[in-house]
Amino acid sequence: GAALHRKDKQVIAFTGDGSIQMNIQDLQTMKHFNLPIKLFVLNNFGYGIIKQFQDTWFDGRYEATGNGYSQPDFGKVAAAYELEYRRIESLDDIKESDLDNADGIFFDVILHPNTLIEPKIDSGNPLHNMFPYLNLPKDAFEKTFIPEEDSDEKR
């Protein structure tokens, strides 16, 4: 939506290797509308955030977050949607020219399977109050993230 609404702005999106499979149709949207989105898939070869919850609440008893989990070859997935693909194993693999590229690019960012996912929402907290917590004034959220009514030019 952001890339369609603000074509004059660069859009960079981050998602996980599990999440992209739940919303894979968005790759067709990128291709169909020729959106120059830079999509970074954080690939820890499992449902990392669920694994963290299993560590926190179930003493690390994992079910379907490592063993029993598999994923497709994301290079082939990107090719199926006719998107450029980059496998990122270190910071040296990211080129400034990739970010300036006018096309959409699927970046497969390879992470260690035990990489912690942060920021994260603690149980019972709203979306804008994620861990690690930021030391912000009480009105910072409203001033920063909630647009004024009928104010397209300010967005």
PLM-predicted stretches and their roles:
Residues 1-155:
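Thiamine diphosphate
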